[in-house]
Amino acid sequence: ETYKNIFWWLAFSKPRGVLGKKFNPVDHPEIYKAISPIYNIPDVSQRKLPPQLLTSATKDRISPVKMIKQYANALKDKNQEFEYWEHLNRNHAYLDSGKTIYAGNDFKKDGIPALKVMMNFFDKHL
């Protein structure tokens, strides 16, 4: 994370890694690799993971489509079950309630289609 992400400014906070200031990805890559899902996918012959639904928004610059597809390819390489869905012409935070002026999202227009995809996934797998 960097200061380029406006949400740090809006929260009056500073960018940090998921493990705080002491352990950052540059100085401790082995720790981040150990907890990163993409590096810890077992082959289906070793352990079958539950089906996963991966969603992305084509205008998302925080969690870009490319990153989600990398994870999808890693699951595919290990023969794990997943479904992938792209929310076309949408930005990050399309599931936020109400309207998000910064992202240009409106829950009624953007969230409902995503929830339908999620509910269909749950109906199929639960």
Predicted regions: what they are:
Residues E1-D43:
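Mobile cap/lid helix-loop segments that gate and shape the active-site cleft of serine hydrolases
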Residues R47-K48, L53-S56, D60:
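Short beta-strand/loop motif that positions the catalytic acidic residue
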Residues G17, K59-R61, F107:
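A generic structural signal for short
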Residues L53-T55, K69, N73-L126:
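C-terminal catalytic histidine-bearing segment of alpha/beta-hydrolase fold enzymes
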Residues Y39-L49, K66:
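Conserved serine/cysteine hydrolase catalytic core
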Residues E1-K4, K59-R61, N89-A93:
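Solvent-exposed loop/turn segments at secondary-structure junctions
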Residues R61-Q70:
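Conserved alpha/beta-hydrolase "acid-adjacent" motif
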